């Protein structure tokens, strides 16, 4: 392999060509690979709870999806129901509800032109914080991962901001320090001027396990569909049949702010 000095000895053109190869290699490797969301879900029996946010290929709609899964009877005994402009989890059979903490909450709330999506009651924390002029990230500083040892389930959150024909979004994960509850690791990912056809996917667990391993890395780059019905069907059919519980999908018109939503519940 030629060194930079050897390339320079061959003359400036050789030096430039050598360095361009290095630059081009770095340029090619720095881009995140777009993943198949369908494949990601089909190959993971238990991602836990998941949030998808993105923009349709035609650039006209902001998209979010939220799903919940469960392994225990208590966790599986849930449905999504509409509440105002958002949704709430509810016990399907109240007589079987053993512990409402951590499983009964509002995953989706709307504050003006902002749509908040989370896997816990931090939805309310974000709503109240932003209503008092705090940022998304600042609002979450008072929260940390869930106290469900030994899993210490991460709190995942997302926010969509649609205003004046523009769309930005952000995602957050609060998780234990590699399973140690003494420290909380906080990560926020912001996406300005969201690109058409692209979205990001974050979920609570890397895979099934005991204890359940927390999500690692930044949100995954995934494709988004123009057709809400097709997107909803793909998501629901890709989730593990035994573990899936409920799915929520919303498409928001970026120009008008009007939205359409779909809810799919396994319990009927």
Label each residue range with its predicted role.
Residues 28-268:
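Conserved short alpha-helical segments that host acidic/polar catalytic motifs at enzyme active sites
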Residues 11-31:
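Short, Lys/Arg-enriched N-terminal segments with co-localized hydrophobic residues
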Residues 5-8:
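Tryptophan (W) side chains
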